[in-house]
From Swiss-Prot:
The PHD-type zinc-finger domain is required for negative regulation of autophagy. Belongs to the PHF23 family. It comes from Xenopus laevis. It holds the Pfam family PHD. GO terms for molecular function: zinc ion binding. This is PHD finger protein 23A. The gene is phf23-a.
Amino acid sequence: MLETTMGEASPEDPPLNLKSLSQPPQKRSRTVEDFNRFCSFVLAYAGYIPPPAKEERAWTPPSSVSPHRTEESDGWDSPDPPQLPIPSDPRQPPASSDISTIETFVMKAKSQGGGGGNSENVEGPVGSGEQAQVKKGSRRKRRQRHRGGVTMSDTDTDEEERGERLAGSLPAPQLPPSAESSRDGGGSSSDADTQVMDEDIMVESGDDSWDLVTCYCEKPFAGRPMIECNICCTWVHLSCAKIRKSNVPDVYYCQKCRGGKGSGGTAPKGEP
């Protein structure tokens, strides 16, 4: 029973010959190079680009064995590598089905007039040319503006230089006589101060007169400004005589000589 069941084929199973015939033949997988070649052929057929150069015709498939590999294989006596299916020669014209698909593709591209990808490729150079013209025009405008700005800046600098020259050529404003007199008074006071300071500088701390006591305040000279009495020839500090450095009199009498002069004492020095 088992032999009969195993030997007999079920009516539902199709025969083996039909299975082998129904399966389609295995096709070679498409690559990026095949797609690029197809696109270039379509564009060349439509007249958008020139036909491929001779270098593309001399293209060799990547599956071909290089001479270095053949030398290595001959040296090592290795068995021949398995031969891969060689792609069809690009110089051969495509089949009728491919031509029909290409024609339909080109007709669709022409009918759309700008919606397809090929129309973009066609309009690309034109649009790029217009954009280039627009960019050139904008650059020219910018250059003109820049030149105008430079000229304006040059004129501004020239005007500034002219203004400075005019300001330098104008005479200085004349001050009123009161201001000049005040300046003169200040100059005389400054001269007196410089004289007193010169006298102070002339006496150093190591000098013998530094510790000399001549004033009625019984304090040493110590480099402070002093004035001499015209009668008794006594040196008195300006601070003790209540005299400012800016207003030093030419003739000075100390307090003692003033009192003696009022009571009919000796005549002052230099008087008859």
